[in-house]
Amino acid sequence: MSNDKYIHTDVEDKIYSYWEKNNLFKPTKNKKQFSVVIPPPNVTGSLHMGHALNNSIQDLLVRYHRMNNYETLWQPGTDHAGIATQALVEKKLTADGIDKNEIGREKFIEKVWEWKEEHGDIILNQLKKLGCSCDWSRNAFTMDENLSKSVLKVFVELHKKGLIYKDKKLVNWDTVLKTAISDLEVDQREVNSKIYYIQYPIEASSDFITIATTRPETMLGDTAIAVNPKDDRFKHLVGKFVTVPIVGKKIKIIEDEYADPEMGTGALKITPAHDFNDYEVGQRNNLEIINIFTEGGKVNENAPKEYIGLDRFEARKRIIKELKEKEFFVKEENIKNKVPYGDRSNSIIEPFLTEQWFVDAKKLSIKAKDIVNSKKTNFFPANWSKTYFQWMNNIEPWCISRQLWWGHQIPAWYGPDKKIFVAINEEEAKLDAKKFYNKDVDLIRDPDVLDTWFSSGLWPFATLGWPDNKEYVDKFYPTSVLVTGFDIIFFWVARMIMFGMEFLDKEPFKDVYVHALVKDEKGQKMSKSKGNVINPLDLIEKYSADALRFTLLSMASPGTDVKLSEDRVKGYRNFLNKLWNANNFLITNNCDFSKIDEKPILSININKWIYAELIETKNKIEKNLKDYRFDEAAKNAYQFTWHSYCDWYLELSKTILFSEDEKAKDEVRQVSAYVFKQILILLHPFIPFVTEEIWLNNKFDNTGKDFLMLANWPSGEFERDTSINQVEKIISIVSELRSFKNELSVSPGSFIDISIETVSKKEQSFFTENEIILKKLGRIKNLYNKDLDKPTATLMVSGDLFKVYFDEDVDLELIKKNLTTRQNKYQEEMNKISQRLANKGFVDRAPKDIVDQEKTNYNNLKNDVERISITIKGL
């Protein structure tokens, strides 16, 4: 290889182009299948760290199964992202001086498609930068013809079964976009607010009942005052009427357990049309529902005329002013509370009573719960199944209509008397209408579109060709695993399970792996406002896609958020260089890569040891990947490559490579190359670019497959024997000597004299046989079996007593003093941590990861203190 260092910018685009040109991402026929569907990113999106983690995990699994001879499909695609895309294109048109309402729906949709064709592949190209090996020939889009056909079929069939219906209910309403939105599109923000105390006059009395509210403007739609049945303060008022100030309407004081005696005054104004909890109270008590706002958030004709047409927040100011003037106002207090904002419009969301289309999610949830209960679909980590059931057991009707133009238009048409005809297309709707009216009539199509989550709920089977093309459905459905974030378990995962069970009577995936969040190095959520957002593309450019992938995978511990720092990525970039340098070492030492298809002869101890380590590492990686312990699998691969192979085996091998024993040298070259080849295969699913580059440069494969990506996963078993134990003893001795030098602040490169007190001839023969290796790696000048008259330190390693000799001018007392000072410092730090951990308040209030880190720090310091004690004792 020409480069001393690995230069990723010369490699990654080139390698990815090779893979694509050779169609390596397509499934190759085999008896067993492995399939994954990508969580479709929004077509408006750009790669963020959550995408990077999610897709690194998927690509690891896909590449691993491909190398294990599975017919592997990774189905890619993007989501049309109704609200996000429409808002973005509207903004662009407005900047160009174009009003969407003037050009009309059809022309506007054309503009959206134009934007999609120009910008829609940006995030897919960014996924390629990460190394994702999706079958791009099957790239799907939720507005594609086949996906649209699936959506229509599902809607029509669910409507026929009575599982889709139209109803008037309270929904999250965006007054800027003028559409219903899902809970996931609502951002609950903690803000500085005020709570207002207002008196409502009691009928036929000079008394008042005082309520507290953060939204006095909604009193225009009040239909009751609620008090708790157990609250004795209001028992004498239950059943009486009060007058709503300003409005003059009489409303009743009722009992309902929703009223909390500890909140506010204990008396609660009920506005069923503009609060979700109030709506439930209204349903239980058969209260009138009065909508007082327009779709744009202005006061409507149901309010006193002087308020009609006012913006809701302007109305609030006017109401407070009038309440004060009429002496109904008691006081106001500053508070902090959570207020719902639309994540696209940045406007405050209004609970709004409106007619919408709904799915009877409760009925669909029955099979969806059974499939998880029966373990046909399993969550990893398992505790996420509890979250799944909590949501499913409290499921509400799902509002699926949106007042947008971009999306799947609802296949419903209205007759002259507003009768609804649901059909696949207008022709069928007209035929149904003709049968109903006994004549041809004009129909008007419902202008609303479906919630984006409706179409993405069909993703696992619609992308495979359902309903018309069953070949891929039969082969790859159910999919093997879904990799997703916890925030969409209900919005997406549950709905895919519901639709999969309803239409294919099969779970859409066997496993659901739920990964954690990627946060900054301090454990804070990344946000633009905090200025702590780390762009994955910047890290890829600076350190390589492989370094970023390996960082994320090595930190993907179940239930623990990833605390990402640039230094970690930089550290794993060094790992790539270590691998690159190992390859250069093999080339320099004439290792032959063309003769390593079969397991080599293993007669030399270090060769037996590294082969045993290889098989053990392979087995650990397989188990950890099966258990979705990506962090442990990455650790296994890293430790074996960096420490076992590079730090130890290659160093041990130098004593043979630089000897005169040609037969031994040939075996070491063979084993070095063979094990390195297996390392490339083991590492490839984690770091595909650098491993493929080394593989292709060395022409490792002569089976015709050429590419590492298509190589077979390592196989083989190996039983450990005494020869392997000997190598491990050498490593243990050298490690202890190096640590001992470090404790004594002796230069690691300096040579020392050692004598060994052994208890058997067998042990003596071990040191005789391995004297050359021990001297070279342990930086030992002389190895004696007798005592010397010099300053001495002793240590025990693997049952043997070692005496380390120093030059006459070494001041052992000064060394002892320095060690004691350091030991005392560590002990002080231990005491401080011990006090913190004994403080129940700290343990209960501090984040779990902080407490765990303190425990780890304590144990590390304890080990250091004990180690120094042993060292001092040996001096």
UniProtKB/Swiss-Prot annotation:
Q: Name one GO cellular component term.
A: cytosol
A single Gene Ontology MF term assigned here is: ATP binding
Q: Which UniProt keywords apply?
A: Aminoacyl-tRNA synthetase, ATP-binding, Coiled coil, Cytoplasm, Ligase, Nucleotide-binding, Protein biosynthesis
Q: What domain of life is recorded for the organism?
A: Bacteria
Q: Catalysed reaction per UniProt?
A: tRNA(Val) + L-valine + ATP = L-valyl-tRNA(Val) + AMP + diphosphate
| Residues binding ATP | K528
**Residue interval(s) of motif 'KMSKS' region:** 525-529
Q: Which PROSITE patterns match?
A: AA_TRNA_LIGASE_I
Motif 'HIGH' region, which positions?
Answer: 41-51
Keyword ATP-binding in annotation: yes
Which SUPFAM superfamilies does its entry note?
Anticodon-binding domain of a subclass of class I aminoacyl-tRNA synthetases, Nucleotidylyl transferase, tRNA-binding arm, ValRS/IleRS/LeuRS editing domain
Q: Which Gene3D superfamilies match?
A: HUPs, Isoleucyl-tRNA Synthetase, Domain 1, Valyl-tRNA synthetase, C-terminal domain, Valyl/Leucyl/Isoleucyl-tRNA synthetase, editing domain
Q: Where in this chain does the entry annotate a coiled-coil region?
A: 810-875
Q: Would I find Ion transport among this entry's keywords? A: no
Q: What class of enzyme is it?
A: ligase
Summarizing the function annotation, the protein's role is: Catalyzes the attachment of valine to tRNA(Val). As ValRS can inadvertently accommodate and process structurally similar amino acids such as threonine, to avoid such errors, it has a 'posttransfer' editing activity that hydrolyzes mischarged Thr-tRNA(Val) in a tRNA-dependent manner.
Q: How does it assemble?
A: Monomer.
Against HAMAP family, the record matches this protein to: Val_tRNA_synth_type1
Read off the domain note.
Answer: ValRS has two distinct active sites: one for aminoacylation and one for editing. The misactivated threonine is translocated from the active site to the editing site.
- Family membership, please give it: Belongs to the class-I aminoacyl-tRNA synthetase family. ValS type 1 subfamily.
Q: What is this protein called?
A: Valine--tRNA ligase
Q: Which organism is it from?
A: Pelagibacter ubique (strain HTCC1062)
